[in-house]
């Protein structure tokens, strides 16, 4: 009897596991053996089950044992936010605790490759954040409400009346086609309440890391260099000679942070 009950328990556990996987995949409308990609499409293979996979039998990326908190020390982060003067909108908004809480949901960030690779990726992330927020002075894009970031061709992520999808947070996430999937992945109403990113420092870092993980991480850790991260973040407006000053500023911050972390910045720094 006991053996039969044990067997029954094992069977029930297996059924529960399969049911959980099925429910996860079905949250995006996918079959149980399919993954919901970062863009909300169903399928199999690395394009669907790799980076950014939201549900289903997602691939689990290999990570090293680096502690992101040991690299982003209290002293490093304090120096970052100290750049913002008292008149800055973001003064007191961005915190190390918020960053580390957000980073906990992205285990591949700063933990892929060698220890030096980890340091370079973290330096790259904060170089862009430093540039985008103008040294951590801003939460929202300057004059953002006056700008139109609604791509009406993105029918999967339709814009909502009265909502502005301008830049917010450390990487200034923009456009409805980014707010929508970011909200779906993280768990907030990105299309209906994009302002939520500017109200919560944790959510601000989560959206930045969501964008980084889905659009920047793979290019950087594959050895394409810092220049590839510029192209992934704002290449259309800065790369190929469009805005050399902005590119130079990003590179300078990256080199500065690499020096602080004691790591060589590598090659292919520009775009």
UniProtKB/Swiss-Prot annotation:
Active site residues per record: 132 (proton donor)
Pfam families: Chitin_bind_1 (PF00187), Glyco_hydro_19 (PF00182)
GO molecular function: chitin binding; chitinase activity; endochitinase activity
Alphabetical GO biological process terms: cell wall macromolecule catabolic process; chitin catabolic process; defense response; polysaccharide catabolic process
Keyword Disulfide bond: yes
PROSITE patterns, alphabetized: CHIT_BIND_I_1, CHIT_BIND_I_2, CHITINASE_19_1
Catalytic activity reported: Random endo-hydrolysis of N-acetyl-beta-D-glucosaminide (1->4)-beta-linkages in chitin and chitodextrins
Entry annotated with the keyword Ion transport: no
Glycosylation site list: 268
All copies of domain Chitin-binding type-1, residue ranges: 25-60
Coiled coil: none
Cysteine disulfide partners in this protein: 28-36, 30-42, 35-49, 88-137, 150-159, 239-271
Keyword annotations from UniProtKB, A to Z: Carbohydrate metabolism, Chitin degradation, Chitin-binding, Disulfide bond, Glycoprotein, Glycosidase, Hydrolase, Plant defense, Polysaccharide degradation, Signal
Expression (tissue specificity): Expressed in roots, leaves, sheaths and meristems.
SMART domains, A to Z: ChtBD1
Signal peptide boundaries: 1-20
CDD domains hit by this protein: chitinase_GH19, ChtBD1
Enzyme Commission code(s) on record: 3.2.1.14
Protein family membership: Belongs to the glycosyl hydrolase 19 family. Chitinase class IV subfamily.
Role played: May function in reproductive organs during embryogenesis and seed maturation.
Protein name, entry field: Chitinase 6
Organism: Oryza sativa subsp. japonica (Rice)
Gene coding for it: Cht6
């Amino acid at each position: 009897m006991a053996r039969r009950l044990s067997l029954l328990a094992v069977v029930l556990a297996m059924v529960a596991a399969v049911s959980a996987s099925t429910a996860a995949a079905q949250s995006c409308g996918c079959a149980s053996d399919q993954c919901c990609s970062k863009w909300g499409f169903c399928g199999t293979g690395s394009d669907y089950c790799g980076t950014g996979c939201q549900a289903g039998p997602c691939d689990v990326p290999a990570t090293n044992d680096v502690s992101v908190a040991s690299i982003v020390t209290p002293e490093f982060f304090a120096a970052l936010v100290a750049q913002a003067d008292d008149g800055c909108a973001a003064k007191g908004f961005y915190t190390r605790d918020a960053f580390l809480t957000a980073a906990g949901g992205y285990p591949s960030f700063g933990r892929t490759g060698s220890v030096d690779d980890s340091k370079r990726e973290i330096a790259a992330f904060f170089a862009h954040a430093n540039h985008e927020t103008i040294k951590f002075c801003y939460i929202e894009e300057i004059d953002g409400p006056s700008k139109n970031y609604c791509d009406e061709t993105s029918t999967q992520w339709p814009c909502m009346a009265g909502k502005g999808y301008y830049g917010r947070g450390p990487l200034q996430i923009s456009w409805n086609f980014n707010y929508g999937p970011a909200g779906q992945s993280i768990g907030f109403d990105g299309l209906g309440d994009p302002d939520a990113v500017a109200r919560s420092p944790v959510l601000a870092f989560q959206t930045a890391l969501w964008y980084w993980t889905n659009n920047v991480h793979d290019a950087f850790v594959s050895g394409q260099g810092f220049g590839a991260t510029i192209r992934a973040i704002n290449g259309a407006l800065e790369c190929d000679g469009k805005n050399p000053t902005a590119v130079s500023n990003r590179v300078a911050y990256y080199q500065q942070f690499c020096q602080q972390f004691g790591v060589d910045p590598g090659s292919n720094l520009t775009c």
